[in-house]
Amino acid sequence: MLNTGTVEARTVRKDTLMMDPRGVPVSYDGQMVRDRYETSLTMLHRFGYDPVPAVEELLEEYPDFALGHIFRAVCIASGSAARYIPEIERSLASAESAGGALNDRERGLIAAVRKRCCGDWRGAQTAVEQVLAAFPRDTLALHLGHQFDFLLGDALNLRGRIERLLPHWDSSIPNYSHVLGMYAFGLEESNLFDHAEAVGREACERDPADTWAHHAVGHVIEMQGRHEDGIIWYGSREADWATGDGLSIHNWWHLCLYLMEVEDYGRILEIYDS
């Protein structure tokens, strides 16, 4: 079907393997759609702004974009609230009925999210690992696994899941910096503070808008009781992490913890009032 105006012509082809910029297969043949999806994916990895409205707008125009529905489900499933399970299931059902042939990677992501919805968190971790074993540059699967590990307090996998994938990555691959940001947090949660800080700072230099990487470095500094360094870390980079409706609010809270330790209560109240 050929759409007019700004709507892109596309087909779902079973005989051609379509790839994203990291070489991960996508079942949708429509470059403009996939480019817009990549923008939402980067938003997800940065933890700065909520990517769901952007992908919902995309899905209004292209309701047969199965990966977009899976992405929406992953975003919602990255939290632990049970009340959102019906919304997650709705997105998964939309992906399955989108009209095209899902690939193995997409079916694997659906299986992982479904296990999470059923309360089988360990099974969900395993399902994500199976996707990553086949597609080690799938950052949507990596994000999902990272959040599962975080919610379960699984420090070993927070670090190890990413270490298993690093041989497949280098700095030329899109979203490499976000992999480093996740790795930094896993290292910090494993008490490997010096390595975590170095990796987290590198991630922030590669993508200054990576709020999760800022958060990882902030955790290191807090764990080491370096309160003045924490104030400098967040204060000197405020333009990079402080905006948005995602993790920036949590990073403000971390900054206030440092300020509380040095008894700068006036600044804390200024932040609260703003």
Label for each model-derived stretch:
Residues 34, 39-56, 60-64, 69-106, ...:
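Inter-helical turn/loop elements of alpha-helical hairpins
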Residues 32, 63-68, 104, 137-141, ...:
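Residue-level recognition of tetratricopeptide repeat
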Residues 54-57, 85-99, 122-132, 155-169, ...:
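Alpha-helical repeat scaffolds
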Residues 36, 69, 76, 108, ...:
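TPR repeat positional signature
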